[in-house]
């Protein structure tokens, strides 16, 4: 691979991921080795190998407990987080608790292994990086990665860590709607005049985000964000799955709900049906031998699908109303509505949204699956100093999704940075002691919108000690909140009289990985990658031996060559070929060297015989090489 490639933009999605690059003045969304422009965010572990992307998703029905998806729902969260606990009920794979952090447990090559969500996400990112490298023919080292607008600090940090484990320099973590707005801003560049309010409606496979941005003179500013971390195509599929499990029970008096493989196959068929129903009014489901040998054939109309999900579809308008309230805008003040995420293709959702905005046209000009990666690729080019005129006058302002503050007397939340403040930002406020001769203060940092800290989320805390004795209210303690462009928070406190300072970067208290953890994971990621490559080479050597063996067998058995070869030679070749075929059947897992050694032995025996044979047959083509290699068919 020659030279250093450009920076890439990665949309690391809950269910699918997408990668783009900005070059030659335009964005290119890159297809993977299967020709798909989005790649499932799935990682599977088997007895012999690790699979990522389409290959992992395609075998999920056979291997549900060792196929990991939805890592984005775990990343940066604690094990006892209520959302983690409720998600665990629905996942076929095991999640275990290690020091308060969730880890997924799988069986890999016959051993029990556990992985942090960051490691699983890093495997998906590695796949996306490789997709880009294969297309560009260059090493890729830098990237911009996107996250949902209301990911908190630890979720952003953990996503950045996943990039680091992959070996990427993550220049910036940006919000998904901001990325979509950039993509959109470029698309609509020629027509801009004055300030525009844009609503971004992003309904993906697993999450739903609504954001309102203003765009003026190339400056994007996020005004508000709202949404539901648990709404998307998967939920619509689940409604169909439940419906069909009941139908199967009714028709066949059998309950297949407890059979993971049957449910998984049913879910895959439902996902296909949902996609079909966006363009057709009816979809059929045909699954052979779904459960206990019974075939399941049924169909679903678009109207029935809409009825099953009526409450969920209608529910998408609540976050729209909340985002409008937060941005202090009336729905009539929204100039543009942008659709992002595959589920926005559902006609009913488009209709509900259009009716809510009194028939306003929706923007569907960008492929909804690709808009976020598109914007991330543009942002990567800007940060790398791309001088192309298409990106020159774009500036990007992001916001903090939640208010940040400290606890003051009586458990009151005192916010220093209000939610939806443009970042980077720095705010300072002076506090004092609560009792006489108080020698230390505890600074507790919270995020959230409630009046009392007990209802908000504790990010971290530290003590400022050594305050000289004084009556209450006299010491002056200056607290500073500083958020950088990635949304990462530093909090410091200084005692004005002594100049004593203490500070915290909000990371570890939220279960962030330590530097040692990350370094170890980087090494492990490299080890797994090397194992994957060794396995590919091993399979290649096995296929080569197999194809050469069958080739030789065919050659000496060829009717046309009868009489050109002595029976003794023919028997020699056939015996040796049979010996190789038997050993291949017995041991599918031999080392590459063993396969190569067997092939050399076989060639040593066959080459002189084949050469004689073809000379005898008037040089009917050289057969002495390794025989044709067989291309893999997926």
UniProtKB/Swiss-Prot annotation:
Family from the record: Belongs to the heat shock protein 70 family.
Record-linked Gene3D superfamilies: 1.20.1270.10, 3.30.30.30, 3.30.420.40, Actin, Chain A, domain 4 (3.90.640.10), Substrate Binding Domain Of DNAk, Chain A, domain 1 (2.60.34.10)
UniProt GO molecular function: ATP binding; ATP hydrolysis activity; ATP-dependent protein folding chaperone; heat shock protein binding; nuclear progesterone receptor binding; protein folding chaperone
Top-level taxon of origin: Eukaryota
Entry keywords, A to Z: ATP-binding, Nucleotide-binding, Stress response
GO cellular component: cytoplasm; cytosol; nucleus; perikaryon; plasma membrane; receptor complex
CDD domains, A to Z: ASKHA_NBD_HSP70_HSPA1 (cd10233)
Role summary: Molecular chaperone implicated in a wide variety of cellular processes, including protection of the proteome from stress, folding and transport of newly synthesized polypeptides, activation of proteolysis of misfolded proteins and the formation and dissociation of protein complexes. Plays a pivotal role in the protein quality control system, ensuring the correct folding of proteins, the re-folding of misfolded proteins and controlling the targeting of proteins for subsequent degradation. This is achieved through cycles of ATP binding, ATP hydrolysis and ADP release, mediated by co-chaperones.
Organism phylogeny: Eukaryota, Metazoa, Chordata, Craniata, Vertebrata
Segments for region (Nucleotide-binding domain (NBD)): 3-389
Entry comment, domain topic: The N-terminal nucleotide binding domain (NBD) (also known as the ATPase domain) is responsible for binding and hydrolyzing ATP. The C-terminal substrate-binding domain (SBD) (also known as peptide-binding domain) binds to the client/substrate proteins. The two domains are allosterically coupled so that, when ATP is bound to the NBD, the SBD binds relatively weakly to clients. When ADP is bound in the NBD, a conformational change enhances the affinity of the SBD for client proteins.
Protein name, per record: Heat shock 70 kDa protein
